[in-house]
């Protein structure tokens, strides 16, 4: 018999959104995760805000959206630190070549990259790249992905297909259902889903 005091908390996921034409897909990812009883917080880069506003993320997650390193809540703890402590899994979808490079090099110049650097070792990081195929296959990006893989970061995609620039090939963000399923799998590995 379980007591009413024994409650299991929802898995906690931070969704990072970067400045890609695929940023609108992150809205569906947040919805996917919320529908599976995940508590979701969203961190957007300044360039992400050029593609999609914070409103759908705030509405679907029922949480404020972090847009700036200096966004603060009522608490004294900086947002990137409190979110790093809070998250069970961080998923960056879409992830640009720029953000991938920054995380690989330890550059922490916005709320999302600071969060990535401040994550607890047991927190899972999943990256869903989205960029032009030439950018994806460039030696610098290949090396940055190798570095992140060696650190235990998981990558999903990119997928093949027609890209916003008109080229066809590898570079599209993986389908939302696949990204979401990988997040759920990472939570299961941590006995949280």
PLM features per residue range, with description:
Residues 1-127, 133-193:
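A cross-family phosphate/adenosyl-ligand binding-site feature
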